[in-house]
């Protein structure tokens, strides 16, 4: 998915019940969440004017907020209707959709009962991106946080600080992204995507209890099983990677993306078998446009 420049967007954004022209959608510089990363969000895709798995995304958005102690002033149904307004107002066909919940600018105290909870829903025009070329990874130096130190199933802005840093470092070193390990050294995920490995007709993927269990990840697992593939969720070590013939990552924006290689530092593992990933990609592309 390729996005156009933000300053070229002339759509309307839904903010706390109002449709606001994109160029007038602003927040105060003393907004609490801007200073303390106290916001949660979702990344969604609209295909042919319909957001894929909107209910699941909305339910997770609310759960993410509740995990941070935020009281969301809207129900699942109300948020879904707000999405529909954004899509209708902007005549959206294919787009990336970003709902965001954040604390207001009433106070900069770490906690304050008077802080407002706000919601916006924005659409960003997108175009399909070519997936002909696979991407190359290295093992990032930063590890995922211990699950009992942060709510890992909350899609919060704070969770992305390390991911952004890791991706920047990967790019600076000539890679496309970083493979991240958990606190025990097991394979976790990439910076913004979940990872799968392939051997024969079996998919292997890390257990999603130490990182966000992606909605695209869950969808791909369902598709794989429907296609007769076996899926094993396990603790995976770096030394196991050379036993696999294929590798790919999943995410809302990237959908299904082949991995060509992973640099382990002492050796580089390459993957030539993309048949299963391509099959899953094709089926996923069909389902999201139904």
Curated annotation (Swiss-Prot):
Organismal lineage: Bacteria, Pseudomonadati, Pseudomonadota, Alphaproteobacteria, Rickettsiales
Transmembrane annotation, as ranges: none
Protein's GO biological process: isoleucine biosynthetic process; L-leucine biosynthetic process; L-valine biosynthetic process
NCBIfam families: ilvE_I, PRK06606.1
Organism (species): Rickettsia felis (strain ATCC VR-1525 / URRWXCal2)
Name of the encoding gene: ilvE
Known role: Acts on leucine, isoleucine and valine.
Residue ranges the record marks as coiled coil: none
Cofactors (names): pyridoxal 5'-phosphate
PANTHER family: AMINO-ACID AMINOTRANSFERASE, AMINODEOXYCHORISMATE LYASE
PROSITE patterns in the record: AA_TRANSFER_CLASS_4 (PS00770)
Keyword GTP-binding found: no
InterPro entries named among the record's database cross-references: Aminotrans_IV, Aminotrans_IV_CS, Aminotransferase-like, B_amino_transI, BCAT-like_C, BCAT-like_N, Class-IV_PLP-Dep_Aminotrnsfr
Record-level Gene Ontology MF annotations: L-isoleucine-2-oxoglutarate transaminase activity; L-leucine-2-oxoglutarate transaminase activity; L-valine-2-oxoglutarate transaminase activity
Chain positions with N6-(pyridoxal phosphate)lysine modification: 155
Protein name: Probable branched-chain-amino-acid aminotransferase
């Amino acid at each position: 998915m390729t996005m156009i420049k933000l300053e070229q967007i002339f759509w309307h954004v839904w903010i706390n019940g109002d449709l606001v022209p994109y160029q007038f959608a602003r927040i105060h510089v003393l907004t609490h969440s801007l200073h303390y990363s106290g916001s949660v969000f979702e990344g969604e895709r609209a295909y042919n004017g319909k957001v894929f798995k909107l209910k699941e995304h909305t339910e997770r958005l609310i759960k993410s907020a509740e995990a941070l102690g935020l009281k969301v002033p809207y129900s699942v149904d109300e948020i879904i209707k707000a999405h529909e307004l954004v899509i209708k107002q902007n005549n959206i066909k294919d787009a990336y959709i970003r709902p965001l919940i954040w604390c207001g600018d009433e106070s900069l105290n770490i906690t304050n009962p008077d802080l407002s909870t706000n919601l916006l829903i924005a659409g960003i025009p997108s175009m399909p991106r070519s997936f002909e070329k696979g991407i190359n990874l290295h093992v990032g130096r930063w590890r995922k946080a211990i699950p009992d130190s942060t709510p890992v199933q909350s899609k919060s802005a704070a969770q992305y600080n390390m991911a952004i840093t890791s991706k920047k470092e990967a790019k600076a070193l000539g890679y496309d992204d970083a493979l991240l390990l958990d606190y025990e050294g097991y394979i976790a995920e990439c910076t913004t995507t979940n990872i799968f490995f392939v051997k024969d007709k079996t998919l292997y993927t890390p257990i999603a209890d130490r990182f966000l269990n992606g909605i695209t990840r869950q969808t791909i697992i369902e598709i794989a099983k429907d296609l007769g593939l076996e899926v094993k969720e396990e603790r995976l070590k770096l030394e196991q990677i050379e036993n696999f013939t294929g590798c790919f990552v999943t995410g809302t924006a990237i959908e299904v993306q082949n991995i060509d290689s992973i640099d382990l530092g002492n050796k580089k593992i390459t993957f030539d078998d993309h048949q299963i990933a391509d099959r899953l990609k094709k089926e996923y592309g069909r389902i999201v446009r139904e």
